[in-house]
């Protein structure tokens, strides 16, 4: 958990080089840190509907969750060759610029990825606020997407759960889940249906509940008997999307972030653009995902923030607010840092 102090702004694309040069002189960083993050937006699969009773106040809330990891940018040229990376300082024109990113949830993707799960509270309200103050709760996990082929002989049963001594009926109750390397935007109904079937199975059989310390990979089911002389393969998968479904969340959106990051004392300054999937693209799915700008105006978003360990550290919070105000005053002729509207930063699910 962190208590984040922040100010935001935006600049047109033609002021990017001037802004970068100014921040390089201010921070002393000739080469800023690169930002390439991929974010999944998820919401709880089941809405909480509290029972309203006279004189009783229910404080239980549900929140949207952000799942953040890194991504690699691939730019495809006219000669059909894929070049690694692209220059964020170049303007991007939707339907003309060709930005293709590699899929994450494929059988070939065996990279160990670090995912950060974030849930943020609504910012602090009140007048005369020097900056936005918000509580952010986060957890980090390491996950590797796997797809392992297992050859099955004639009539050999599949042991779905090696830690479970029960076979037979329990094996046939397991739902079949096939993803074939699809992205979250392509797995709309499959994940939801499979998640619902799995939750029902878990309710009926408490011994199949997934343990966080030792997660069991999902396995396809096969018939108990196979025809003579025929071998069949099954694929055991461990997908991050399955983990979210087991956690009780479903993916509703996604976006990519590309930019640079500066450090000025305790202040982190990020300059970035946000990309989304180009739904109008007819490119082959094997080539990857084509992106387009979320904002057609080509503006850069700017965020300056400080993370405080605890909200009870009053001295650190007051010192951080003063530092952000000083930075705001110093850069006022370049761009104006301001407090974002707290209502747009409310991640609570409306009942």
Curated annotation (Swiss-Prot):
Name the predominant localization: nucleus
Which residues fall in a compositionally biased region of kind Polar residues?
Answer: 217-231
Q: Where is the composition biased (Acidic residues)?
A: 205-216
Q: Which UniProt keywords apply?
A: Activator, Nucleus, Transcription, Transcription regulation
Q: Which family does it belong to?
A: Belongs to the Mediator complex subunit 18 family.
Q: How does it assemble?
A: Component of the Mediator complex.
The name this protein goes by in its record = Mediator of RNA polymerase II transcription subunit 18
Q: Which gene encodes it?
A: SRB5
